[in-house]
Amino acid sequence: MAVISMKQLLEAGVHFGHQTRRWNPKMAPYIFTERNGIYIIDLQKTVRKVDEAYNFIREVATQGKKILFVGTKKQAQDSVKEEAERCGMYYVNQRWLGGMLTNFQTIQKRISRLRELEKMEADGTFEVLPKKEVSKLLHEKEKLERFLGGIKDMKELPGAIFVIDPRKERIAVAEARRLGIPLVGIVDTNCDPDEIDYVIPGNDDAIRAVKLLTAKMADAVLEGNQGQSDAQ
């Protein structure tokens, strides 16, 4: 039994690709037809590919490894945060800071600074500092929280990365590939599927499509976590 149905995919508009003039020929195997200058994705293939990605993510979670959800485009930001939080995983939904994976130690220092500022705010240190100083520190904290809030508990590199639109997230994809971290991704008709280990052919521009597919990956994590606790 497939984890997602054609009906769900159709209702969410997962089948709408990009305009035909903006395409990557490597996506040809996943294209069903062309309609009014737009490529239509073959949803039978998407159903199979979602199954493969789901099984892989579930397996990673069963092994106790973490998954990093990445989607910084407007249409993905809310879904990425909500679904990653729902399954207790990490996320980046604002901007990918170069080196988030390849320069992990430096990023850890920035996270330590964020924790330090949070502690200062919680233990009353801010109350005894001059207003101007506090305002500066709060601004610094907000900025760090915005970019690093979703990975502040990440102590080691993730076991896999789920990415929405590998073209937009090309720096994240390049870093993951360099480190040999497996990639699962929603890949639209204008992307290069060769960069992604588990390709989910689908619309990466519609909020409903992104939400549906991201939620499925979060479900896979939850099922994998359940499998891990059952095994213990």
From Swiss-Prot:
Keywords: Ribonucleoprotein, Ribosomal protein. It comes from the Bacteria. GO terms for biological process: translation. InterPro entries: Ribosomal_uS2, Ribosomal_uS2_bac/mit/plastid, Ribosomal_uS2_CS, Ribosomal_uS2_flav_dom_sf. The keyword Ribosomal protein applies. GO terms for cellular component: cytosolic small ribosomal subunit. PROSITE patterns: RIBOSOMAL_S2_1, RIBOSOMAL_S2_2. SUPFAM superfamilies: Ribosomal protein S2. GO terms for molecular function: structural constituent of ribosome. It holds the Pfam family Ribosomal_S2. CDD domains: RPS2. Belongs to the universal ribosomal protein uS2 family. NCBIfam families: rpsB_bact. PANTHER family: 30S RIBOSOMAL PROTEIN S2 PROKARYOTIC AND ORGANELLAR, SMALL RIBOSOMAL SUBUNIT PROTEIN US2M. This is Small ribosomal subunit protein uS2. It comes from Heliobacterium modesticaldum (strain ATCC 51547 / Ice1). The gene is rpsB.
